Amino acid sequence: MNSKHSYVELKDKVIVPGWPTLMLEIDFVGGTSRNQFLNIPFLSVKEPLQLPREKKLTDYFTIDVEPAGHSLVNIYFQIDDFLLLTLNSLSVYKDPIRKYMFLRLNKEQSKHAINAAFNVFSYRLRNIGVGPLGPDIRSSGP
Protein backbone atom coordinates (compact mmCIF):
# COMPACT_ATOMS: atom_id res chain seq x y z
CA MET A 1 0.00 0.00 0.00
CA ASN A 2 1.65 3.22 -1.15
CA SER A 3 0.89 5.69 1.62
CA LYS A 4 1.69 9.12 2.96
CA HIS A 5 1.31 7.67 6.45
CA SER A 6 3.24 5.10 8.40
CA TYR A 7 0.97 2.22 9.45
CA VAL A 8 1.84 0.38 12.67
CA GLU A 9 0.88 -3.27 13.19
CA LEU A 10 -1.61 -3.98 15.98
CA LYS A 11 -0.01 -6.95 17.76
CA ASP A 12 -1.59 -9.81 19.74
CA LYS A 13 -0.22 -8.42 23.01
CA VAL A 14 -3.19 -6.02 23.19
CA ILE A 15 -5.39 -9.06 23.96
CA VAL A 16 -5.16 -9.84 27.68
CA PRO A 17 -6.90 -12.99 29.00
CA GLY A 18 -9.61 -12.43 31.61
CA TRP A 19 -10.68 -8.97 30.39
CA PRO A 20 -13.60 -7.89 28.18
CA THR A 21 -12.75 -7.73 24.48
CA LEU A 22 -13.67 -5.42 21.64
CA MET A 23 -14.33 -7.70 18.67
CA LEU A 24 -13.88 -6.33 15.15
CA GLU A 25 -16.62 -7.91 13.04
CA ILE A 26 -16.34 -7.52 9.27
CA ASP A 27 -19.07 -8.61 6.86
CA PHE A 28 -17.96 -9.18 3.28
CA VAL A 29 -20.14 -9.40 0.18
CA GLY A 30 -19.29 -10.15 -3.43
CA GLY A 31 -16.69 -12.16 -5.27
CA THR A 32 -17.19 -15.92 -5.20
CA SER A 33 -18.67 -15.86 -1.71
CA ARG A 34 -21.96 -15.01 -0.11
CA ASN A 35 -22.00 -13.48 3.34
CA GLN A 36 -18.41 -14.14 4.37
CA PHE A 37 -17.58 -12.62 7.74
CA LEU A 38 -14.66 -12.36 10.13
CA ASN A 39 -14.59 -11.92 13.90
CA ILE A 40 -11.21 -10.66 15.08
CA PRO A 41 -10.33 -9.91 18.72
CA PHE A 42 -9.28 -6.27 18.50
CA LEU A 43 -8.49 -4.96 21.99
CA SER A 44 -8.88 -5.95 25.65
CA VAL A 45 -10.72 -3.22 27.54
CA LYS A 46 -11.47 -2.30 31.16
CA GLU A 47 -15.05 -1.33 30.33
CA PRO A 48 -17.37 -1.38 27.29
CA LEU A 49 -16.94 1.06 24.41
CA GLN A 50 -19.87 3.46 24.05
CA LEU A 51 -20.02 5.94 21.19
CA PRO A 52 -22.35 8.97 21.06
CA ARG A 53 -25.78 7.94 19.72
CA GLU A 54 -25.79 10.54 16.96
CA LYS A 55 -22.62 9.11 15.39
CA LYS A 56 -21.78 5.87 13.61
CA LEU A 57 -18.56 3.89 13.95
CA THR A 58 -17.73 4.80 10.35
CA ASP A 59 -17.54 8.46 11.45
CA TYR A 60 -14.55 7.53 13.62
CA PHE A 61 -13.06 4.36 12.15
CA THR A 62 -12.23 3.60 8.50
CA ILE A 63 -11.01 0.19 7.34
CA ASP A 64 -9.51 -0.99 4.07
CA VAL A 65 -8.89 -4.66 3.28
CA GLU A 66 -5.90 -5.13 0.97
CA PRO A 67 -3.81 -8.06 -0.33
CA ALA A 68 -0.39 -8.49 1.30
CA GLY A 69 0.83 -11.24 -1.02
CA HIS A 70 -0.71 -14.00 -3.12
CA SER A 71 -2.59 -15.60 -0.23
CA LEU A 72 -2.38 -13.11 2.66
CA VAL A 73 -4.41 -10.03 3.51
CA ASN A 74 -3.96 -7.03 5.80
CA ILE A 75 -6.70 -4.86 7.26
CA TYR A 76 -5.63 -1.23 7.38
CA PHE A 77 -7.46 1.25 9.54
CA GLN A 78 -7.50 4.94 10.24
CA ILE A 79 -8.84 6.07 13.61
CA ASP A 80 -10.29 9.50 14.37
CA ASP A 81 -8.71 11.39 17.29
CA PHE A 82 -11.83 11.03 19.49
CA LEU A 83 -11.95 7.24 19.08
CA LEU A 84 -8.16 7.00 19.43
CA LEU A 85 -8.25 8.71 22.84
CA THR A 86 -11.30 6.69 23.90
CA LEU A 87 -9.79 3.32 22.96
CA ASN A 88 -6.48 4.12 24.64
CA SER A 89 -8.28 5.19 27.84
CA LEU A 90 -10.29 1.92 27.89
CA SER A 91 -7.42 -0.37 26.93
CA VAL A 92 -5.97 -2.84 29.44
CA TYR A 93 -2.62 -2.66 27.61
CA LYS A 94 -1.16 0.86 27.91
CA ASP A 95 -1.79 3.13 24.88
CA PRO A 96 -1.61 0.53 22.09
CA ILE A 97 -3.74 2.36 19.51
CA ARG A 98 -2.31 4.73 16.89
CA LYS A 99 -4.07 6.77 14.23
CA TYR A 100 -2.87 4.54 11.36
CA MET A 101 -2.65 0.81 12.02
CA PHE A 102 -3.03 -2.58 10.37
CA LEU A 103 -3.77 -6.18 11.30
CA ARG A 104 -2.27 -9.19 9.52
CA LEU A 105 -4.84 -11.86 8.81
CA ASN A 106 -3.87 -15.51 8.97
CA LYS A 107 -4.32 -17.74 5.89
CA GLU A 108 -7.82 -18.89 6.84
CA GLN A 109 -9.03 -15.33 7.54
CA SER A 110 -7.32 -14.08 4.38
CA LYS A 111 -9.15 -16.73 2.35
CA HIS A 112 -12.52 -15.23 3.33
CA ALA A 113 -11.43 -11.73 2.33
CA ILE A 114 -9.99 -12.97 -0.98
CA ASN A 115 -13.14 -14.99 -1.79
CA ALA A 116 -15.18 -11.82 -1.26
CA ALA A 117 -12.82 -9.84 -3.53
CA PHE A 118 -11.99 -7.56 -0.54
CA ASN A 119 -15.49 -6.07 -0.72
CA VAL A 120 -16.47 -4.96 2.82
CA PHE A 121 -20.23 -4.64 3.29
CA SER A 122 -20.14 -3.49 6.92
CA TYR A 123 -18.03 -3.57 10.06
CA ARG A 124 -18.49 -2.98 13.76
CA LEU A 125 -16.69 -3.09 17.10
CA ARG A 126 -18.70 -5.30 19.46
CA ASN A 127 -18.27 -5.44 23.23
CA ILE A 128 -17.69 -9.03 24.39
CA GLY A 129 -17.80 -9.78 28.13
CA VAL A 130 -15.62 -12.20 30.06
CA GLY A 131 -16.44 -15.83 30.74
CA PRO A 132 -17.06 -17.29 34.19
CA LEU A 133 -13.33 -17.80 34.84
CA GLY A 134 -12.35 -14.31 33.62
CA PRO A 135 -11.80 -12.75 37.07
CA ASP A 136 -9.71 -15.74 38.19
CA ILE A 137 -7.63 -15.67 34.99
CA ARG A 138 -7.18 -11.91 35.34
CA SER A 139 -5.94 -12.18 38.94
CA SER A 140 -3.41 -14.88 38.05
CA GLY A 141 -2.02 -12.62 35.30
CA PRO A 142 -0.21 -13.58 32.10
From Swiss-Prot:
Disulfide bonds: none annotated. Keywords: Host cell membrane, Host cytoplasm, Host membrane, Membrane, Viral matrix protein, Virion. It is found in: Virion; Host cytoplasm; Host cell membrane. Its main location: virion. It comes from the Viruses. The keyword 4Fe-4S does not apply. Homooligomer. Homotetramer. Interacts with phosphoprotein P. Binds to ssRNA. This is Matrix protein. It comes from Borna disease virus 1. The gene is M.
